[in-house]
Each structure stands twice: as C-alpha cells, then as structure tokens.
Amino acid sequence: MEIRRVTRLTKDDVSGRDFSFEIFAEVAKPYEALALGAEITTNPIAVTKKDFGFDESEFENIKEPDDVLFTVVEDERVYGYVHAAKSWNNMVEVRFIVLDVSIRGHGYGRKLLDKVVEWARELGVAGIRLESQSNNVAACYFYRQYGFKFGGYDEYLYKGIAQNKDETAFFWYYMLD
C-alpha cells in the first residue's frame, strides 16, 4: 500500500470499502481533565455501528494549495483517506480521516497524519486542529497517542441532529511551534 496525494475522490474510488466503526463506550466526564493530560476514562454504552457515509461533492475539486487530500492505495483501490484544509486562523483543519476496517491498526492512520503534518509545516501554519466525538473512543486514544492535545469540547454542537444529539464534540490540537 502507498500514500498518494490526489485532487479528487469519487464513490467508485471507495466502492466496496467499509469505513464504519463500532461505538461501545463514551469518554467519561469531566472532560476538562483531558486538557490537563489526564488519562482517557470511559463509560460503557450500548454497542452501535456508525458510518459517516461518503459525499462525493466534498471531494470533487480539492483546491490546492489550501486543501490537500491523501489516500491509502493498493491496486488502484482506495482503502483510506485524509482531507485537510488551511483555515482562517492560520491552522490546518483535518476535515475527514477514515480507514477501511481491513487496514486499521497497521499504521496507516499515522502515515496519513504524518503527511498532513508535513504539508502543514510547508504552509507555515501554527498547528493542526481536528474534531472527534465523545463516543469515538478509539479515535480519541489515537489522536492522544499521536501527540494531539485536547483543546476543548462542545456539548451542544450535535443537539440538532437526532441520531447524534447525545454526542459531545471534542477538539484536538497538534501545535507545530
């Protein structure tokens, strides 16, 4: 498998991939403790499967140099991707990072983030920001292990989305200075 920089991604490119993940716990409060470097502790919740889907319009025309899209490719099939963009606050925002279930745990998430960090350094931005959810515990562990710092949370961000109303948005930062 190789990491490639591309300027578009289609449904055909990701056809047959399973980007879903299992929700089995949520990060325990108080969330403020995460900002102080506390260990991530969890509470069990009912097991469900979550899939963000794929909206081709999000990936039709990646506008370089302010957007970047890296893919994990084997035999011309995409098994994962990360989309990031330069934001108004001189930060890079990771908009999507997903991996097919068949390649999780093999270092490809780290390789994709390494490419984003390299790109962000080329841009000369202050750091990288991304959002996760309180019930995506595996992602929280991964971002913390990579070196992201917990920057805050928003308990109201998803209240207007019925299926996500109980989730809390977490914001993670990887500073480059």
Which residue stretches match the model-derived regions?
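Structural preference for beta-strand elements that scaffold enzyme active sites
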Residues: 91, 127-129
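Residues within well-ordered beta-strands of beta-sheet-rich folds
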Residues: 73, 129-131
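Short secondary-structure boundary/hinge segments and terminal tails
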Residues: 32, 94, 121, 138, ...
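Acetyl-CoA-dependent GNAT
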Residues: 7-9, 16-95, 100-102, 113-114, ...
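Conserved acetyl-CoA-binding loop-helix of GNAT-fold acetyltransferases
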Residues: 99, 105-122, 141-145
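Extreme N-terminal starter segment of soluble prokaryotic enzymes
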Residues: 1-3
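C-terminal "cap" of GNAT-fold acetyltransferases
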Residues: 126, 133-137, 146-149, 156-177
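Conserved phosphate-binding and hydrolysis motifs of nucleotide-dependent enzymes
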Residues: 76, 80, 107-109, 147
